[in-house]
């Protein structure tokens, strides 16, 4: 019995240490101090994404690679079931679900939302995930986030990445649409 208590004690100690690694409460979020990240040209993130509205919801793993010419999103369903790769350039969206590859011309937000069946404002989200507002649109700062284009964007937890502080947990809500992102890993270059 004493042996099991010792093992559980060690396990609790080790696991609690994992949660102390460079994470900060959302109180550390300050939009103006982060605006320089609008200039971040290349980045990548791996994490978990949840999308929901009043009719549907989905939870996905996400890998997102961004550079000025291309956004590549790899979305995978629970237990690896279902995969969609989305590539976005300034004038084209390519959606590949493994069975078919579809090429669309037009506005990325509308195309992606139609293909996923849920609202995903990709053109602004590529800024929001960095903790900054979309520089092309007006915004109103709020405690822990901001309003932009009808969306309330909030940062629940921050994390140190290189010499910057970036979101660990963020949410965005507009009417009945909800986006929740948890970033497990950032790569800035």
Describe these PLM feature segments.
Residues 131-189:
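Gly/Pro-enriched, hydrophobic low-complexity segments
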Residues 35-55:
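A short, Trp-centered hydrophobic/proline-enriched beta-strand micro-motif
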């Amino acid at each position: 019995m004493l042996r099991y208590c010792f093992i559980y004690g060690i396990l609790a100690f080790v696991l609690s240490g994992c949660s102390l690694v460079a994470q900060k409460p959302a109180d550390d979020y300050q939009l103006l101090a982060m605006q320089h990240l609008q200039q971040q040209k290349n980045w990548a993130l791996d994490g978990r994404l949840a999308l929901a509205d009043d009719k549907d919801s989905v939870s996905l793993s996400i890998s997102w690679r961004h550079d000025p010419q291309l956004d590549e999103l790899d979305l995978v369903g629970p237990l690896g079931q279902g995969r969609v790769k989305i590539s976005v350039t300034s004038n084209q969206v390519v959606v590949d679900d493994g069975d078919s590859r579809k090429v669309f011309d037009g506005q990325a937000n509308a195309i992606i939302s139609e293909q996923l069946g849920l609202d995903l404002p990709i053109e602004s989200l590529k800024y929001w995930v960095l903790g900054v507002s979309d520089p092309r649109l007006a915004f109103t700062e709020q405690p822990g986030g901001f309003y932009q284009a009808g969306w309330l964007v909030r940062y629940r937890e921050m994390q140190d990445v290189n010499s910057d502080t970036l979101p660990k947990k963020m949410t965005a809500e507009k009417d009945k649409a909800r986006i929740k992102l948890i970033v497990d890993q950032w790569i800035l270059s």
